[in-house]
Amino acid sequence: MIMAKPESTSASMQQSSAQKTDCEQPRAIGEGQQAGRLLQNRLELVEDLWQTVLRSECPPDQAERLLRLKQLSEPLALEGADENSASRAIVLLIQEMDLAEAITAARAFSLYFQLVNILEQRIEEDSYLASMSSGKENNRQDKPYDPFAPPLATQTDPATFRELFERLRRLNVPPAQLETLLQEMDIRLVFTAHPTEIVRHTVRHKQRKVASLLQQFQSDPTKSTSEKESLRLQLEEEIRLWWRTDELHQFKPSVLDEVDYALHYFQQVLFDAMPQLRRRLITAMAESYPDVHIPQAAFCTFGSWVGSDRDGNPSVTPEITWRTACYQRQLMLERYVNAVQKLRDQLSISMQWSQVSTPLLESLEMDRLRFPEVYEERAARYRLEPYRLKLSYTLERLKLTQHRNQQLAEAGWQTPPEGLNPSPNLINAGEALHYKSVAEFRSDLELIRNSLVSTDLSCEPLDTLLNQVHIFAFSLASLDIRQESNRHSDALDELTRYLNLPKAYGDMAENERVQWLMEELQTRRPLIPSAVIWSPSTAETVAVFRMLHRLQEEFGSRICRTYVISMSHTVSDLLEVLLLAKEAGLVDPAAGHAELLVVPLFETVEDLQRAPAVMEALLSSPVYRNLLPRVSEQVQPLQELMLGYSDSNKDSGFLSSNWEIHQAQIALQDLANRQGVALRLFHGRGGSVGRGGGPAYQAILAQPSGTVRGRIKITEQGEVLASKYSLPELALYNLETFTTAVLQNSLVTNQLDATPSWNQLMTRLAGRSREHYRALVHNNPDLVAFFQQVTPIEEISKLQISSRPARRKSGAKDLSSLRAIPWVFGWTQSRFLLPSWFGVGTALAAEVESDADQLDLLRRLHQRWPFFRMLISKVEMTLSKVDLDLAHHYMTSLGREDYREAFNRIFEIIETEYSLTRRLVLNITGQPRLLAADPALQLSVDLRNRTIVPLGFLQVALLRKLRDQNRQPPMNDAGDGRTYSRSELLRGALLTINGIAAGMRNTG
């Protein structure tokens, strides 16, 4: 046996696993009951496939025990039964398992949850397609105006383009206002790697194959019985192959592995999805606003931190960032080569039967002189087909650009341009023949398009390609550099000590630092000697800026123009980066020129509160202000600021973090208005509620009025990429709801923004919540031990899932060194989910107890204020996932005896707060139970409710064995003849972590 009987397994197991993921999972569109029926109908197939695979892959007696375990954990099995007895039966069944069978059980339940996740994704995709189809049938005459409908500003259900534009038309939003916003709109989605991305890329590939087969199986009801049987056999075969694939990473992925993983979504989905998004926008606009012109420029683009985020990740070197840029460029060039080849095949227009524009003919003559070999080869064939000839020249230039890019990747960033040895065909009469910028490529395509238009022709593939060029350019996604603020101050301290200045930088007070930095910025004298051997840290810091200059020199500024400073506290934190950038040639304050956008990241509550004062000091400085970029000559200078959800939540709890970020946005926008500066807020949202996650549509609508204005930048965490961008229609759903939310927030003045009394109420709630949270998390001396012993945090750190360490400082065990992502991951695995709700109940209770009328006020806020409704919705969703019975089992089984009394006190605090929070959330929403207002989500809750519990029991048993310091391996229990090593036990524990993450649809 591998498990001792738990000391406490009580009845409810709550609504535990329930899981609509904290991360952005698109809700099924339409009535919840309809989505629920879809799930029920299709679940039968998935469960049957799962059982078939287990019976074919496991010994008969083992397969039956696994199926029995699943049956015991189903909600329907508990109707009219004693839930305690079901829990005991689960425990007894697990007790009979040896380690090998326990590992098989963990794998089986992990597979089950991943199949259900795929099923739900398919339902979400099908629901979106159904909504698009029904939307086409329901024109505006079918929907008379409803005077009793809630104001648009308070509607937080995701809207399609068609729905939103019709609402805007009814609200008499002027076409000119909408057109102006579209011209200025700038949505940026920034993909990140994720330190707890749990699923191997190989397994992701298997999941996509299963999803594709499920789509084929279910999409066409006219398929014959034999066709369906064939597809079912393919599904069984693919799932069996998946079952025989190792779920765990065999080695720690490199940064370039992570780059490849992130770029997969561009290759497979986004490159083709973005033009579809634009077409849907144009079609919907034509129905409600036929006179509005949609600009060609991209309204939604992408960024990436994968390969460029070096904060706490020593593996991200300047060379890695350089290679990442080259890799992204090569991927785009390959796509463009393929697209141009297809266009050449299609545009067979002959000059005998069609006019051709003069500019196009003139360009062909220039191309003939530059590419005589191409002319010799193609002229005879395409003599009367100018478009094919032009595209042949275009294709040649793209291939030369590919060749140049390959040289750059191989040579590395430290090789100067003159150090490259280009092939002779790259140069003709001293002119470089490859595309030196994407503008040159776009110009060639526009020449072709303009010529076609002048003869009353259009070409949708060409329009699609031009749209892709506007969105992705040659870079695919802009790389943001991120580094922690201390790295820059440490480098300047070492530099000033070497220069033997009267006072070293590290010894200066903040006002002295600012004065010295300003003086250095305004001089043209170099500061950094070139022939000095610095410490490795300083050498790398300086090298990053030099690499950036070389990168922009070769690829243009679009590839990498943003530098994010994490843990920004003061004015000097930004000026330090500007000075280092000046030394590398990225910034010239004397000329008022900058090729780098310096972005402070304010993360802790104190820094969020301090942010307006820091930025006011900077924006009041002519030196700093002159270095802000301008989007165009007519637009104000742009300041980008990043707001950190993860660390502020870890620092002060969910409610306080969200309110401080909300308040900071208002104060920063007021400052920008006074200073005449355009503000772009960069939201560092994580996948989980404890790190700012949740439905993006609601989150964007909950932003204070006037803070979006068509500009927003948001991180898309690595762990949510598969759930949002693995399927084309899911990707379109997310992209469309992002866009409609930005449009709605920007165009519809929210008449229900917070009143002064609401602000005062929220300030009180945030303060009380923060106080209660910090009393437990930061001031309780036993909390760190509780977290380390009761959650699988140490085992999580052993998962080979990321190039980035889980802790900021190697070997450190304190809370401050632990990153926010594994902090949330640990609490999620053990079913506390504490960072996402703790402190909320105490704050709400204090308000209600002070005045009974405050409950009515809180209910009104929930109905009328999108920000408050978003908060309560997130807390409600999180509470539905908490399972304190299972969490108590973690504590009693894994906590050391000498901590028992202290841990019991901590658990009592958590349990009391949970009950209080749950009661008050239900009082505010007016619902009889959590998630009662969302039937589709509730069905998902019921589906996963207890099914995840056996994995929790298995995990505890394996962790207990693994951590038992009094029994060194090999281990042996009565009735178990096998000998186990620690590596085998660790493997089993890690598999349960995989399974629970799949069941929760969330890690950190």
UniProtKB/Swiss-Prot annotation:
Its EC number is 4.1.1.31. Pfam families: PEPcase (PF00311). One of its GO terms (biological process) is oxaloacetate metabolic process. Keywords: Carbon dioxide fixation, Lyase, Magnesium. Residues 1-25 are annotated as: Disordered. GO terms for molecular function: magnesium ion binding; phosphoenolpyruvate carboxylase activity. The keyword Magnesium applies. It catalyses: oxaloacetate + phosphate = phosphoenolpyruvate + hydrogencarbonate. The active site is at 194, 650. Residues 8-19 have a biased composition (Low complexity). It is an enzyme of class 4 (lyase). PANTHER family: PHOSPHOENOLPYRUVATE CARBOXYLASE. Belongs to the PEPCase type 1 family. HAMAP family: PEPcase_type1. This is Phosphoenolpyruvate carboxylase. It comes from Prochlorococcus marinus (strain MIT 9313). The lineage of its organism: Bacteria, Bacillati, Cyanobacteriota, Cyanophyceae, Synechococcales. The gene is ppc.
